[in-house]
Every structure is written in C-alpha cells, then in structure tokens.
C-alpha cells in the first residue's frame, strides 16, 4: 500500500488530468479520483508513460480521501454549479476538521463565498481558485488565482508555487484575497480574453477583406507582430493557425472553420458585473455581442441574400490601399484597443475590490498573468509597472507611458476604423474601444442634454456647472409658453 499522498485531485477531464500530472511531475505524490472510473485508469496510465510519476488512482471517494495525508488538501476540477456542490457533498462525508477543498473551475464568485461559509461551519477550509492556461498550461505551468481562506492557501502554497508557470518575477500565482476574489479575478481575466480575441479577429478581417492579404501573408504579419510590442500567446497562436493546411481538402483550415463562436459564460458574467458596478466595459461587451451575432449564422446567410439583392455586397467597395501602410496602421490600432480592453478589466476588478473590501493588488495580478495564462503578453509587465508607480491609478489610459502610446497611435487607429466603415466591415471592438478612449479623454460630453431630457419627462433634476445643488426646471411649460 502506498504511503499517504501530499494532495488529492477530483475531476479528471483534460484540465484535471494535466494538472494532476503537473503536480506529480513536480515531486508531490498525488491521489486522483473521478466518478467515471475509466478516467482514473487513463490518468494512472498516462502517469506511467510520462515517467512513472507518483500518481495514484482511486475508484471510490472514501479510499481516495483516506489516501491523502492530514490535513488533507483536495483540488476539484469539475463543471461549475451543481456538480461542484455534489462533489463537495461526496468528499466532505469523509473529510475531517482542518481539511481543505479547492475549487479550480470557472465558478461564479458568490457560489464560492456561499460554499466557504458552509465549509467553515463544518470546520473545513475552502478556496476558489481560477486556473488559466488551457490544457497545455495545466500540464506545464498555469497561472493560478486562489482566493478565500488564507489558511487554506498556506496549506498548499508550496505546491502551487512549484506547479505554476515561472517568469522572471517569480511563479504565476499569488494569494488573491478574501471570499470569492480568486474566481472574480479569473472571470475578469476571461472577459479581457474575450476582448483580446475579438480585436485580433477584427484585425484579421480588415487585413484580409480590405488589404487582400493571403493566409501566408497573414501568418508572416502576425509572426512579425509577435516579435514586438504585441508579443503574446494569442498573437502567437493566431500566426500558427494561418499556417495550417486543411487535411480534409484543399486550402487552409481556418477558411473551413464555421464562423460561429462558442462560449461558456464567463464573458457574459463579466458584462453583467460591469452593469452592476456601473463600470464602462464596451470592448468586452462588444466582444460578447459579436459572439451572439456570430451564432445567428442562418439569419446572417438570409440577410446577406436580401441585401445583396438590393446591391449591398459583403464588402462595400474595393479600396486601393498601401498594404504596408495598412499593416502598420492595423498593428497600432490593435495595440491601442488592447490597452482599452485591459484598462476596462482592471477597472472592474478595482471597483469590486472596493465594494467587497478585498484590497486587491492590480500590479500583482498583472504579474501573475505574465506566464501560463491565455492573455499572457509582454506588455503585462508594463501594466504591473504602471500600478507599481501609482497603486491608485484611476485608469491605465492616463498612466504617463500608456497615455503617450495612445496619443502616438490614435491617428492610425482612426484610419483603420474609418477604412472598415467605408468597406462595410464591422469592427465593434476597435470602434467601441475608440469611442471609450474619446469619451474618457473629453472634458465635456453631451450628457448634459441627456440629463436635461430626463428632467423634462421625469423630473429627475440636474446639477449645474456654475451653482452647487440639485435643480428642476418646468421645461414643458417654458417651451409651450413661448409658442
């Protein structure tokens, strides 16, 4: 019989398997369990094939829990919602006071807070831990965002710091904060990811539809961008995608992929939280809307027929463009819009941190996103430095370095958006990011008229720019008295 293991992991889908193997490879003996026992056997076999790693499989929850040294630490990687509650119920029947459960899935933060409270009443510790990096990251080093019981974090800190992605500033993991902060931060990470991916897709559309770049040229362009300021995981994989030939037919695989984007819900949660917190996040919101519209494939096919019959083609005009100039303009537009997406995400995190008194460190979040995760990018180091310079920075756009870059790139950004509008190509991410930038940098907006309208029909009052206090005007009476 094997000696007690250091940790347990329940839930052996792709992420669970790979994280378990990563933990074992780092020298921590691990017990694994899955309700479908074939997954247990599959994981044990992989551990043997990948170097006789210290991984032990169990087919029933009681023997699984009893195989782990005390105080026990168990990571769950199961589907969010009811499956998490069911797994907790199964495991907690065999756990003892001081043991710890960690939810490593994409869970709604309030569910984590509810579960932490329920576990505390039983004498158990609980963490909600966002894990980013996909299957490759889980196996070789993810970015991890644990929040909840600090005592629970200390029980597993030695493992997490070894298992996480490693960058020049240390492991890509840190204790995020109290309650559901870890899950909340991971949710916003995913919202930023939505924005990032949408902006890249729009850059691709403009280059292909207006610039007429081939897949070979697109591969070269994105590979070149990945050697500069846009260096990131998403730009890297985009270059890779453009180079893959279709193994089931002629041409390139990307052109055969149905233009219908799926989603699992974290982007929607992010936009809902933006509304709840009254934080503008148009880049992220437009990326979600774009996914909704992509899902209307059949309707779009019919709409295209209707408008083509009326003379409105897919692309409105074949514009003659300087290809080299266009590529450089799109690069600058993508970078500037990307800054807006990250600024919106960070503002959401800060607003929630204030509301919940989490005291989150935005610079440290940028640091742990530098490696392992899907949004890892070179410029995250500069975001960290911006918050190091000013922890109370109200918006990334006004950091001295980032504001300078926005000023330098805004002309190219406007050219790209105008070009796309002229060609009838939708760029909701770039356009909404530009509108966000323009609204934020203007001292006075036309909101005065909107507030006057509200006071006219609803007596909602208004403030004046010259006299303090709340005012109401009988707009209707004044207007009609002049007739």
From Swiss-Prot:
One of its GO terms (biological process) is pentose-phosphate shunt, oxidative branch. The active site is at residues 186, 193. Its main location: cytoplasm. GO terms for cellular component: cytosol. Substrate binds at residues 106, 132-134, 189-190, 194, 264, 291, 454, 460. InterPro entries: 6-PGluconate_DH-like_C_sf (IPR008927), 6PGD_dom2 (IPR013328), 6PGDH_C (IPR006114), 6PGDH_Gnd/GntZ (IPR006113), 6PGDH_NADP-bd (IPR006115), NAD(P)-bd_dom_sf (IPR036291), Pgluconate_DH (IPR006183). It is an enzyme of class 1 (oxidoreductase). It is found in: Cytoplasm. One of its GO terms (molecular function) is phosphogluconate dehydrogenase (decarboxylating) activity. Transmembrane segments: none annotated. Pathway: Carbohydrate degradation; pentose phosphate pathway; D-ribulose 5-phosphate from D-glucose 6-phosphate (oxidative stage): step 3/3. NADP(+) binds at residues 11-16, 34-36, 78-80, 106. Gene3D superfamilies: 6-Phosphogluconate Dehydrogenase, domain 3 (1.20.5.320), N-(1-d-carboxylethyl)-l-norvaline Dehydrogenase, domain 2 (1.10.1040.10), NAD(P)-binding Rossmann-like Domain (3.40.50.720). It comes from the Eukaryota. Catalyzes the oxidative decarboxylation of 6-phosphogluconate to ribulose 5-phosphate and CO(2), with concomitant reduction of NADP to NADPH. Homodimer. Belongs to the 6-phosphogluconate dehydrogenase family. This is 6-phosphogluconate dehydrogenase, decarboxylating 1. It comes from Spinacia oleracea (Spinach). The lineage of its organism: Eukaryota, Viridiplantae, Streptophyta, Embryophyta, Tracheophyta. The gene is pgdC.
């Amino acid at each position: 019989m094997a000696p007690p293991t250091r940790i347990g992991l329940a839930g052996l889908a792709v992420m669970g398997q790979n994280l378990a193997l990563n933990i074992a490879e780092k020298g921590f003996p691990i017990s694994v369990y899955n309700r479908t026992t074939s997954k247990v056997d599959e994981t044990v076999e992989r551990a043997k094939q990948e170097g006789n790693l210290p991984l032990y499989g169990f087919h029933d929850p009681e023997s699984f829990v009893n195989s782990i040294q005390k105080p026990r630490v168990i990571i769950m990687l199961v589907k969010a919602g009811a499956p998490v509650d069911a797994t907790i119920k199964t495991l907690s029947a065999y756990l003892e006071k001081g043991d710890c459960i960690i939810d490593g899935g994409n869970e709604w933060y309030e569910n984590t807070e509810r579960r932490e409270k329920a576990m505390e009443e039983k004498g158990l510790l609980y963490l909600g831990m966002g894990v980013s990096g996909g299957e490759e990251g889980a196996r070789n080093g993810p970015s991890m965002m644990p929040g909840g019981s600090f005592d629970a974090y200390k029980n597993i800190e030695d493992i997490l710091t070894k298992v996480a992605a490693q960058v020049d500033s240390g492991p890509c993991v840190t204790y995020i904060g109290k309650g559901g902060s870890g899950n909340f931060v991971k949710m916003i990470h995913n919202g930023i990811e939505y924005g990032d991916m949408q902006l890249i897709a729009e850059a691709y559309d403009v280059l292909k539809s207006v610039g007429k770049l081939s897949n070979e040229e697109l591969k070269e362009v994105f590979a070149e961008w990945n050697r500069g300021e846009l260096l990131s995981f998403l730009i890297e994989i985009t270059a890779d995608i453009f180079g893959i030939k279709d193994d089931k037919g002629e041409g390139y695989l990307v052109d055969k992929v149905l233009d219908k984007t799926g989603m699992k819900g974290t982007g929607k949660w992010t936009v809902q939280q933006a509304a709840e917190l009254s934080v503008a996040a148009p880049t992220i919101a437009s990326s979600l809307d774009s996914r909704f519209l992509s899902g209307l494939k059949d309707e779009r096919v019919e709409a295209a027929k209707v408008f083509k019959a009326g003379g409105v083609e897919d692309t409105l005009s074949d514009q003659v463009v300087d290809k080299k100039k266009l590529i450089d303009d799109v690069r600058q537009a993508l970078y500037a819009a990307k800054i807006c997406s990250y600024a919106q995400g960070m503002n959401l995190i800060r607003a929630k941190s204030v509301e919940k008194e989490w005291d989150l460190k935005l610079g440290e979040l940028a640091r742990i996103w530098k490696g392992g995760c899907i949004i890892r990018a070179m410029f995250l180091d500069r975001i960290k430095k911006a918050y190091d310079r000013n922890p109370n920075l109200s918006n990334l756009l006004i950091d001295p370095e980032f504001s300078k870059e926005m000023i330098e790139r805004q002309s190219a950004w406007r050219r790209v958006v105008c070009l796309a509008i002229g060609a009838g190509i939708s760029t909701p991410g770039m356009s909404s990011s530009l509108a966000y930038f323009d609204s934020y940098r203007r001292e006075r907006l036309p909101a005065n008229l909107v507030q006057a309208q509200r006071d006219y029909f609803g007596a909602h009052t208004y403030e004046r720019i010259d006299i303090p206090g709340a005012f109401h005007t009988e707009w209707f009476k004044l207007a009609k008295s002049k007739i």
